[in-house]
Amino acid sequence: MVNFRRLTLAAVTAIFLIYGGLLASLFYYFDGAQFLATLVSERTLFSVGLSMAAATLATLAALLLAIPAAYALSRYTFPGRHLVDTLLELPLIVSPAALGAMLLIFFTNPLGAWVQEHALQFVFATAGVVLAQFVTIVGVAARFVKAAFDEVSPRYETAARTLGATPSGAFFSVSLPLARNGILAASALTWAKAMGEFGATITLAGTMAMRTETLPIAIFMRLSTADIEGTVGLVLLLVGLGLGALFAARLLTRRRYNG
């Protein structure tokens, strides 16, 4: 009879070997001097700076919507609640390229054209990078934050209300502090997802060097010119930034459960 524990551990090992093997294969083409040259190049510094700035702005904007929306979905019953809750999964079931195409099509209609002409230029512009990232992460951010609020018992808010707190007062003084670590972890994960966003960004903002060239787009452009060593350097940089964000999220989640 197959040992169940060994079977499950074998599955864990298989997953580790898949991703670990992919990461290890990068070092076949790794060159230290080329890696350093890639890191300090003007285009790399620009793409890293743009990626981090855009991801930060997109994450902050997403959280401004996600936190109140997630709280409403976690606490209230209202018409269309299940529909909205389902739509949060849209970025997970629709490819980023499709989301980017939706945005591009929107800006070709009269309303979108008016926004482009009188408000802000998004198509093939830096603002389009932020918008593309925002659209791909806001639903995911709301899902993560809702999970944090779901773990906070409504009884704490009820107790605060009986002591005279208003609904908003109970939210800011009780629910938000108790969900803080979960929200911070959600922020880190959302930021990491924004950093790695490619499909929607390239569809809406294009691949203009030193203008809309985020780190994932820089990887694509290096690979398209058969610059394998440069591609490896940028991939390792993106992986390092992403793993750093994931480590922060994991640490915050652990603190959340350990009190």
Task: Show where each model-derived region lies.
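Membrane-water interface segments at the C-terminal ends of transmembrane alpha-helices
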Residues: M1-D31, E42-D150, V174, L178-G199, ...
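Helix-terminus/linker motif at the lipid-water interface of multi-pass membrane proteins
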Residues: Y29-T38, T201-G206
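Short glycine/proline-centered loop/turn elements that form peptide/ligand docking sites
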Residues: V152-Y156
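Core catalytic ATP-binding domain of two-component histidine kinases
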Residues: G169-F171
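Glycine-rich helix-loop "coupling/hinge" segments at transmembrane-helix boundaries
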Residues: A200-D227
